Design a protein with these regions (language model features):
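A short LG(V/I)-centered, amphipathic sequence patch enriched
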Residues: 41-58
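Short helix-coil-helix linker/hinge
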Residues: 1-5
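Helix-turn-helix DNA-binding elements, focusing on the entry/boundary residues of the two helices
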Residues: 18-19, 37, 51
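Short, solvent-exposed amphipathic helices
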Residues: 61-79
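Short helix-boundary/capping micro-motifs
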Residues: 12-27
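Residues within the DNA-recognition helix of helix-turn-helix
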Residues: 29, 36-39
Length: 91
């Protein structure tokens, strides 16, 4: 099952083009980023990033996944805003 943190890791790598930069941005170790991406690729059955000399770029499958990941993150955020501790539907 896709988890919010894994999507955050994916988006950070996609935005920074680097596992190391993504790890700094998220405040986690580089191996944690690498493991999350590997697990995500295994789970989806898709190679999401092309790796070369410390830099990564999205594959065509990765580009499509990014579109969906962006939408999922939006809905996570919107749901949290509406139903979270201080949300509009919280007493």
């Amino acid at each position: 099952m896709l988890e919010d943190f894994r999507l955050k890791v994916f988006m950070a790598v996609a935005e920074t083009g680097s596992f190391t930069k993504a790890s700094r941005k998220l405040g986690v170790s580089q191996p944690a980023v690498s493991q999350n991406i590997s697990s995500l690729e295994k789970e989806t059955g898709a190679i999401l990033f092309q790796r070369a000399r410390g830099e990564v770029s999205l594959t065509s499958e990765g580009l499509v996944f990014k579109e969906y990941a962006s939408r999922i993150q939006y809905w996570y955020s919107a749901t949290s805003e509406m139903f979270g501790q201080k949300g509009k539907f919280t007493s």
